Swiss-Prot record:
Carbamoyl phosphate binds at R55, T56, R106, H134, Q137, L266, P267. The keyword Chaperone does not apply. This is Aspartate carbamoyltransferase catalytic subunit 2. The gene is pyrB2. One of its GO terms (biological process) is amino acid metabolic process. Catalyzes the condensation of carbamoyl phosphate and aspartate to form carbamoyl aspartate and inorganic phosphate, the committed step in the de novo pyrimidine nucleotide biosynthesis pathway. One of its GO terms (cellular component) is cytosol.
Length: 310
């Protein structure tokens, strides 16, 4: 397979075709089984976080280092010239991109990564832009699903919780729609999946259902994707009302399919109780670990032609 990801901006999961997603998953699997600590030797990658992050930033920087690359950047954009001196994002990107071979950005404003790609002289990878897209999270989700199910095809997938602002569920739904999966959206009315995602599913002829409880679909699921209500996107009164809308307990897992796996982009608050952690269905910590391999795969394919023949 030709590596069409080489030197490409990765802003939205919709920037990637089905074959490209399959190539990334295959590359992640190869790098997990056979580490390659020299692939990014002499490559410099900028890691620029204008919004708080733990797992995304650390797994991305770990991915660069384990491939032999070097990192420049910052974990808090508030302490940069953009944050302190009023420099524009466009100017910051033009300067920083002149120092590196790839530019990884997280920002709290929707569209910031796309804007960065217009001014960057090197490929831009979106690490999350507001409530819009989070494509690298989607890649580790796809890898985790493939790893546990042996396929991405024709799966029964439920998304639960904050589907309105949860950028991870937007991106993953778009990706899995390329693999003929059936979707079940479980959310309170205030947090329903955005209309544009539903419209895309309709256009593609994908099956989906809407629910306010998990009970009626639990026994049919292959993947249960839980999300937290994102406190940073609500005022305190609304957050307190919504935060406990859906809580998964171990008792709710009676009668589920043997192959069911529970995923969560983390951090969790109280939407998955700790008694679920010890069940054979919990996979969210392994999922987080897979972030390193998925981001290694993406970096390798964007910056080299090493795995184009997988």
């Amino acid at each position: 397979m030709t590596n069409t990801i080489y030197n490409k901006n990765i802003i939205s999961i919709s920037d990637l075709s089905r074959s490209e997603l399959e190539l990334i998953v295959a590359t992640a699997n190869e790098l997990k089984q056979n580490p390659r600590p020299e692939l990014l030797k002499n490559k410099v990658v900028a890691s620029c976080f204008f919004e708080a992050s733990t797992r995304t930033r650390l797994s991305f920087e770990t991915a660069v280092q384990r491939l032999g690359g070097s990192i420049i950047g910052f974990p808090d954009g508030g302490n940069t010239s953009l944050g302190k001196k009023g420099e524009t994002l466009a100017d910051s990107v033009q300067v920083i991109s002149s120092y590196c071979d790839a530019f990884f950005i997280r920002h709290n404003q929707e569209g910031a990564a796309r804007l960065a790609s217009e001014f960057s002289s090197v490929p831009v990878i979106n690490g999350g832009d507001g409530s819009n897209q989070h494509p690298t999270q989607t890649l580790l989700d796809l890898f985790s699903i493939y790893e546990t199910q042996g396929t991405l095809e024709k799966l029964q997938v439920a998304f639960v919780g904050d589907l309105k602002y949860g950028r991870t569920v937007h991106s993953l739904t778009q990706a899995l729609s390329l693999f003929d999966c059936e979707f079940h959206f479980v959310a309170p009315k205030a947090l329903l999946m955005p209309d544009y995602i539903i419209d895309e599913l309709k256009e593609k002829g994908c099956k989906y259902t809407l629910h306010e409880t998990l009970d009626e679909i639990m026994d049919s699921l292959d993947i249960l994707y839980m999300t937290r209500v994102q406190k940073e996107r609500f005022d305190e009164t609304e957050y307190q009302h919504l935060k406990s809308s859906f809580i998964l307990t171990a008792n709710m897992l009676k009668g589920v399919k043997d192959n069911l796996k529970i995923l969560h982009p983390l951090p969790r608050v109280d939407e998955i109780t700790t008694d679920v952690d010890s069940t054979p269905y919990a996979y969210y910590f392994q999922q987080a670990k897979n972030g390193v391999y998925a981001r290694q795969a993406l970096l390798t394919l964007v910056l080299t032609n090493e795995f184009g023949d997988l």
